Structure formats: structure tokens, C-alpha cells
Amino acid sequence: MGKIIGIDLGTTNSCVAVLDGGKARVLENAEGDRTTPSIIAYTDDETIVGSPAKRQAVTNPTNTFFAIKRLIGRRFKDDEVQRDVNIMPFKIIAADNGDAWVESRGNKMAPPQVSAEILKKMKKTAEDFLGEEVTEAVITVPAYFNDSQRQATKDAGRIAGLDVKRIINEPTAAALAYGIDKKQGDNIVAVYDLGGGTFDISIIEIDSNDGDQTFEVLATNGDTHLGGEDFDNRLINYLADEFKKEQGLDLRKDPLAMQRLKEAAEKAKIELSSTNHTEVNLPYITADATGPKHLVIKITRAKLESLVEDLILRTLEPLKVALADADLSVTDINEVILVGGQTRMPKVQEAVTNFFGKEPRKDVNPDEAVAVGAAIQAGVLSGDVKDVLLLDVTPLSLGIETMGSVMTKLIEKNTTIPTKAQQVFSTADDNQSAVTIHVLQGERKQASANKSLGQFNLDGIEPAQRGQPQIEVMFDIDADGILHVSATDKKTGKKQNITIKASSGLSEEEVAQMVRDAEAHADEDKKFEELVQSRNQADGLVHATKKQVEEAGDALPSEDKEKIQAAMDAVDTAIKGNDKEAIEKATQNLIEASAKLMEIAQAKSQAQGGDNADAGKQANAAADDVVDAEFEEVKDDKK
């Protein structure tokens, strides 16, 4: 069985790790980096992922996608999505089923389809390191992801050609990375995870006893639309407003200018974590009738902190809720772990320190801990890591809509998973032959205020008075936190397994089609790579042949020169096209046309070899006249 890899599919950056010699190892991508920007760009003839996609974003803003994780498993009409519609340079659209999709060059794409490109790069990175095909993975998600978002993440894995063996919560993965080497004792750890697009807090008990380790999540909370991207946007808006005050021009109407502004704002934010002031300097940011305009604005750390103060405060309320749900106080927390790049901001660290009354640990890499934890969980599943038990929870309550549009909960939030729950329901009217079961996720009493996961009808109920039929509804949450529902008519004993047909999400057919498309693109990518290789070989041969023709000079007959030149011209013409066979044929013709040239080069080489042999004889003769002498080493005491 091949290795199961661990992938942190992040909003801003992604990371892949694998167990190597019993230890989790973070892998470097093709660019030599341990993290990969979660950016995907579509051009006329290829899909670009990671740093290369980020570099070309300024010239291709409408077809370069970032922070796609904020759209995964979401409805277009969601408030969070509508906020992004107004600020993203790319097009966010409503799919036929109401989901939030994106559009590039007229192609409509689901977020899992776009995210799959990042997962494919992570898969390739692992395959290059391991030297074998990778087909299985553990993928992390924010702890506060709902059922739709978790299912969409699994779909992304499938489209990328991965069998997702487990979906694991990011804070839990970070706790695994932190606690795996802690051999003794019982620790209660708070994992504060503020990433690029999401925020989570998990309270986790780590019990290490005689080599056995249990990681039990006591409570989790968070906000799936709060992260570093929001911090960036505050700074972007400030810079755009300041420029408008100075120049009277609104940069928000210029996608190219906004892309440059985004890069500069992100860079300035990072710099202000280690310095008290910086300058954003963007020459030729835009132009009007009076000429080009330049943006030069100084920013202090204090200014940035004032712009994002409310965002930092927003992270504190979930901390209070998680502690209350775990029935703990801040004094019960032994260690605080910071995860996610945004936690490098000093003001964030200060807020966390003040809340818990203790300094967070500095020995956990906030960018890599989640991927390391995913690799450890992969090791647990494959049997390579033993004596580790992970007990995670469902972040939100699950239930169904009952009379009066009330949500009746079957499984409470922070219940350890996997778990099952059942409850008996009945009909609301006499002789009712079918019931509609509306499955919900959330904490509100009013059904419509919660997340709808879908609904199904149970038909064939025997006619009876209202309240007499007994229908047992079973909720089953698997280890990935994904819900399965079944229903049983207790009178007949007939059980029916129900697959929720959610109003949102990708159907089985859509996922299968996307998998086929991805496989087709894989073939295209391979052919493109082979074409480029043929072009490079042909180009190299032309360059070498030209050099040899010059070196041969008059020794090469003019007839052969003409023949070689014609063959080189044919190669140059073939290289400009996309026909690999034509390039290889032209290359072979050039090799054959250069036969005389090869003979001249070989003869010249042999002649030089003869000269070298004569020179060698002279050198040996001179060596016979050399007299060996004793010598004494003189040491310089002044050194």
C-alpha cells in the first residue's frame, strides 16, 4: 500500500507533509518552497498554480483565483459571499443550484474544481519526493466548517485523483503536531488558529500515559469568514481611500491597479509585524489626462492595528464560547498554541496573551503545524503511528425541522465523533402518506435561521390518524464530520437508507465529470510537457550545429553548408508549431544532414588528441630531469 499524505489546504497557502522514517516531514515544492500559495490562474493554453500564478496575477487579475476556500460549499446569496463579490477582481457567479461558483474566460467552475488544482500540485510534490504514485490523503479543514463545506472539500480531493481517507480539523491537526512528542502527563491546550480566510478555536485535552496518547477535543468554535484576507482588505481600502483623497481617482475601478495594491498591502502587513513603520510605493499605479500617477503612502504599525482592531476583537467571543462549552476557565488552560500566518501579528499575540493570561508557545511553526498533524493522522490510519487516539467533535448541532418551523436537535454541537443518534417522529395530519424531513445544521431555534443541508421525502406511510405512525430518523456522523441519514417505518420494520439530496453541492455525476476532465487535462499536460521537451532538444541542436558550422569554416563544403542551413530552417519552422512528431522529424533530418559536419569535428578531435600525445611525451621527458629534494616546513607563528 502506498503512503497516505497529509495536506493542509489553506486559504492563502497550502502545505503537504508525509511520514518519513517515523517523523512527519514537510515537503518542498518544485519551486523549492515548503508552502505553496493557494492561487490558480487560467491562461489561453495552461493552468498555473502557486508562486508562478501569483507572479502573473498583476497582468491577469480576472482569471487569477485566490481565497477560493472562502467560497467552497457556500451559497451565492450568503452574506459572506456577497461581500467577496464586491471586492474580488475575479467573477463570482450563481450556479444553477444556487451555489457560489467562479467564471474564467467563459468557463463556469465550482470551487472544488478550482481547489483540486492546488491539491494536484500537493499530490505531485509528494510523488516527486516519494518516487511513487500517491492516491490517498488526509486533508484538513477549519474546525467550524459545516457539512456542505466538508463534503465540497472531499469532492475537491476526488477531482484531484485522491481518495480522501479522512477530513481532520485544522486545530486538532496542530495539536497532534505539538503533542505527539510529549510523553507524559495530562495537558489542556487551546489552539488559536487565525489563517488566511478562517478562524477556529479548539480546546483539546492531550493525555500522554505510558506511551499511549489520547487527543480529545472538548469544544470548538470559530468564524469561517474571518482571516488574513480581511486584514489585507482593511489595508487595501485605506490605501485606496488615501489615494482618492490625494489624486481624486478611485483605484477600485481598475483591476490591474487593485491587484498591485493587494500585493503591496500584503507585503506591508507582513513587514509591520517586525518593524514600526513602512512605505507603500507604487509608481505608475494609474493615469489620467494629466499624466501618470504614483502611490506613495507611509503606514505605521499603530495605524494598521487601528484598522483591524475590531477583527481581532471578533476572535475573542468564540474563545469565551468554547471555554464555556468545555466547562472550563482560562486558568484551566495549560498551553496556548498559535496557528495560521496571521498570528504572527504582534497585536494578535498580545490579545491572545491578555485573554489567557499566558504567553503562547513559540515552538510551533504556524504555517506547517497543520500539515504535520495531517501527516501524523495519515500515519495513524496506515498503522505507521501506533498508540495515538484522536477524538474530534462536530462543531455545530444537527437536527430536523418540526411543527411550527422549529429546529429539533438530534446531535448537539461538540459531540465526539463518530456518533449516532435517533429519534421517533410522526405525522402532522390524518392519513398522511408521506413526510418531508428537512435536515438542518446550526444553533438557532428557528429552522430558517440555520444552515439547510437538504431534505427528502419518506413515502409509502400507511394511512392512519395524525400522530400514530412512528418514523425513526437516524443521524450518523462519520469520522470526517459528514452526516448520513436513514429512516425506518417502525410499523412495517422496513428500513430505508436516505442519501440527502442537498439543494447545494455537487451531484455525483458532476463530480465524476470533473474527475474525467481532470484526467483529460493530465493527459494534455503530459503531452504539453513532451512537446516542450522536443522543442528544447531541437533548439539546443540548432544552436550546437550553428557553432560547429562556424568552427568547421572552409573545411565544410558549401553544398553541405546549404543542406545543413535548410535543415536548421526546417527545425526553426517546426518549433513554432505544436506538432511534436514534425519537430522530431525535422530534428532527425538535421542530424542526418550534419553527418559531414560530424566527420570534420571527429577528425579535428583526433588531430588534437595526437598533438596532446606529443605534448605528453615532451612533458614526461622533462619530468625525467627533475631531482627530488628534501624540504622542511616553516610554520608562521604570526598567523
Swiss-Prot record:
UniProt cross-references to InterPro entries, sorted A to Z: ATPase_NBD (IPR043129), Chaperone_DnaK (IPR012725), Heat_shock_70_CS (IPR018181), HSP70_C_sf (IPR029048), HSP70_peptide-bd_sf (IPR029047), Hsp_70_fam (IPR013126)
Entry keywords, A to Z: ATP-binding, Chaperone, Nucleotide-binding, Phosphoprotein, Stress response
Region described as Disordered: 604-639
Biased composition regions of type Acidic residues, renumbered to the chain: 625-639
Induction data: By stress conditions e.g. heat shock.
PROSITE patterns, alphabetized: HSP70_1, HSP70_2, HSP70_3
Residue numbers carrying Phosphothreonine: 198
Pfam families in the record: HSP70
Keyword Cell division attributed: no
Record flagged with keyword ATP-binding: yes
Composition bias type Low complexity, residue spans: 606-624
GO molecular function: ATP binding; ATP-dependent protein folding chaperone; unfolded protein binding
PANTHER family: HEAT SHOCK PROTEIN 70KDA (PTHR19375)
Biological function: Acts as a chaperone.
Family according to the record: Belongs to the heat shock protein 70 family.
Name of the protein: Chaperone protein DnaK
